């Protein structure tokens, strides 16, 4: 009988030891899995934050790195949009937002990206891409399109209508300049001034009360002048056609 009791107690101890060992192994494997998952998630989050520059949504961060092929800026509701990438081949600018709208995008350097992004009322539009082949600006609220156009052989073209009391699109500059900006609806200043050393044309014409007319094309080529601004102020509704350096543009008041 004593032998049976000892054998039962021995089996009980062996079973208890096996259960304890199994529990320890399971808990250790679970903790390792949790640590591994935490490490992967942390690595992904850190990678996104660094790669995008402000994380998904852009926030108030100025996205896009400088240098060769800078990244694009993010979007952000109610925030300042992401900034453009600098360096050679800079990325595009940020998106729209609340108060200050689209970011001042456009990469500087050769092949600068376009600056997109319209803002709400009171927001600034997208910035233009600088450098050779710079891109155009975007639309906006109080201040409309960005001042596009590159300083090289790029066709600029800063398009975008402004909001109430807003400025119109910016002019395309550079050699072989691009077209001017669009009209600002009810804007104080209408179309931009398209200019450049090539055959850039200045489109525009600000509609609304007190709107200034379209900008003139010009440069060394045959840039056509912009149209006049409609609305209620004929005195300021002129398009200044022609440009410096022998441009053949023409502009006038268009009711």
Curated annotation (Swiss-Prot):
Its main location: secreted. Expressed in emerging leaf primordia and young leaves. GO terms for biological process: cotyledon vascular tissue pattern formation; leaf development; leaf vascular tissue pattern formation; phloem or xylem histogenesis. Disruption phenotype: Defects in venation pattern in leaves and cotyledons, post-genital organ fusions in all aerial organs from organ primordia to young expanding organs and glaucous and rough leaf surface. Disulfide bonds: none annotated. GO terms for cellular component: extracellular region. Residues 63-88 are annotated as: Disordered. It comes from the Eukaryota. Keywords: Secreted, Signal. It is found in: Secreted. Residues 1-21 form the signal peptide. Involved in leaf vasculature patterning. This is Glycine-rich protein DOT1. It comes from Arabidopsis thaliana. The lineage of its organism: Eukaryota, Viridiplantae, Streptophyta, Embryophyta, Tracheophyta.
